[in-house]
Amino acid sequence: MINNLSISSSLIPDKQRGSVESQVFYLTNRVLRLTQHLQLHGRDYSSQRGLWKILSKRKQLLVYLSKRDKLRYDDLIGQLGIRGLKTR
C-alpha cells in the first residue's frame, strides 16, 4: 500500500482555505485515497459511489473556475496534474 499519493499542501496558502482551488485540492486528495482503496477492494460499491460523488463535485468546481478565471484554472490543472475538462 502506497502512502505517498497525497498532494503537498504547500500548493495552497493558509489564507485561502475556502477558495475554489483549495476545495479542488482537497477533493483531489480524497480521489487519490479512494482510488487506492478501490484498487485493494474492487467490489466496495459504496466507496465507488462516494468516489463518483466526489468526482462530480470536483468537476462542478472546475467548470465554475474555468468560466470565472481561465488562468487560475490552467494553473490549478497544471499544479495538480489532473486532466482538464472536455469541451464541446
Curated annotation (Swiss-Prot):
One of its GO terms (biological process) is translation. This is Small ribosomal subunit protein uS15c. One of its GO terms (molecular function) is structural constituent of ribosome. Keywords: Chloroplast, Plastid, Ribonucleoprotein, Ribosomal protein. Part of the 30S ribosomal subunit. One of its GO terms (cellular component) is ribosome. InterPro entries: Ribosomal_uS15 (IPR000589), Ribosomal_uS15_bac-type (IPR005290), uS15_NS1_RNA-bd_sf (IPR009068). The lineage of its organism: Eukaryota, Viridiplantae, Streptophyta, Embryophyta, Tracheophyta.
